[in-house]
Curated annotation (Swiss-Prot):
Residues 138-347 form the Tyr recombinase domain. CDD domains: INT_ICEBs1_C_like (cd01189). This is Integrase. Its EC number is 2.7.7.-, 3.1.-.-. The gene is int. It comes from Staphylococcus phage L54a (Bacteriophage L54a). Keywords: DNA integration, DNA recombination, DNA-binding, Hydrolase, Transferase, Viral genome integration, Virus entry into host cell.
Length: 354
């Protein structure tokens, strides 16, 4: 019995060795990707991003490159080349995927060079003053509430938009600024998630722009486990949501093509709105109002963090409300706002007359 098992094992090993000789790097990546999709249990959005990164790895490497011909020197050169095209974060992820693919080759093809990527290092680029300024502009990109109101009112009075679109986009702007939700979380919001009586919202998903059985737009789980949360809302937000729900009921009654899927921020067909459309309206309104910032839906999320910081809400409470697991981003915005408040206090003290 023992000898039979040994013979079977030897036969399988020989088969793996034979297949390994003709296995290309691209074929390995494709096989690993298919295996990973079936076994990882990752959400749709994560897997779509993964597919894109694998596609980019293949785009920048030879289709006929055999796995057996690859060595550490080649991979280091390849990583260096990728870093000239993609961000440091993207290259780090790409290298991670390649390491997983190599592990797959070891497991299923008896590939002998398991540690081929272990000594490959990610290139480090020195940041220019321009890079630092761009990072700071992105990190500290928030609005004053007066500016949010200006943008909201501009959209509400924009005659180039249909009445329903004005109500929904302006509502999305205001709700985001006063809740700190990610745009995907806002668009995934359903009537059942909103408790108008107790003024709470259950944030339990995000929208992925794919076609599904019910229509266009699939509600997936939140970005992280910590992103799933329940938050309090004020009367203003409750009224905005109530008004939008009423608009949706009108659509359901009078528009035959409207399918009620339970979402709040919807198109004329009942599907979740596109975040890109809201971003376009936001950017256009900000430009028309001479707000010299790159205003996006994420700006509104930072705006909420800054608003809470100005109200002296604790860092921990802010992180819980906006669903931040990593405190890095929250701290940067929080610190920037509190430093600004300190400067304003100093200026007021200077003006005191003794």
């Amino acid at each position: 019995m023992f000898r039979l098992e040994e013979k079977i094992k030897e036969k399988l090993n020989n088969k793996s060795s034979s297949e390994l000789k003709t296995l290309t790097f691209h074929a390995l990546l494709d096989e690993w990707l298919e295996y990973h999709i079936k076994t990882s249990g990752f959400k749709v959005t994560t897997l779509d991003n993964l597919k894109t990164r694998i596609k980019n790895i293949k785009k920048n490497s030879s289709q006929n490159l055999l796995l057996n011909k690859i060595d550490t020197k080649y991979m280091q050169t390849f990583i260096n080349e990728l870093s000239n095209v993609y961000s440091a974060n993207q290259v780090k992820r790409q290298l991670g995927h390649m390491k997983e693919a190599i592990k797959y080759a070891v497991k299923f093809y008896n590939y002998p060079n398991e540690h081929i990527l272990n000594s490959v290092t990610l290139p480090k680029k020195s940041k220019t003053i321009e890079d630092i300024e761009k990072e700071e502009a992105k990190m500290y990109n928030y609005l004053e509430m007066e500016q949010v109101i200006q943008i909201r009112d501009f959209i509400l009075n924009d005659n180039n938009m249909q009445y329903r679109a004005r109500i929904l986009v302006a509502g999305a702007v205001e709700v985001q600024a006063l809740t700190g939700m990610r745009i995907g979380e806002l668009l995934a919001l359903q009537v059942k998630d909103v408790d108008l009586k107790n003024k709470t919202i259950a944030i339990n998903g995000t929208i992925h722009r794919i076609k599904c059985n019910a229509g266009f737009g699939h509600k997936d789980t939140t970005k992280t486990a910590g992103s799933k949360r329940k938050i309090a809302i004020n009367s203003r937000i409750a009224n905005v949501l109530k008004k939008i729900m009423l608009e949706n009921k009108k659509m359901q009654q009078w528009e035959p093509s409207y399918v009620d899927r339970g979402f709040i921020f919807t198109t004329c067909q009942g599907n979740p709105m596109q975040g890109s459309r809201i971003n376009k309206r936001l950017s256009s309104a900000a430009e028309s109002l001479n707000i010299n910032k790159k205003v996006t839906t994420h700006t509104l999320r930072h705006t909420h963090i800054s608003l809470l910081a100005e109200m002296n809400i604790s860092l921990k409470a802010i992180m819980k409300r906006v669903g931040h697991r990593d405190e890095k981003t929250t701290i940067k915005v929080y610190t920037h706002v509190t430093e600004k408040m300190d400067r304003e206090l100093e200026q007021k003290l200077e003006k005191l007359v003794y």
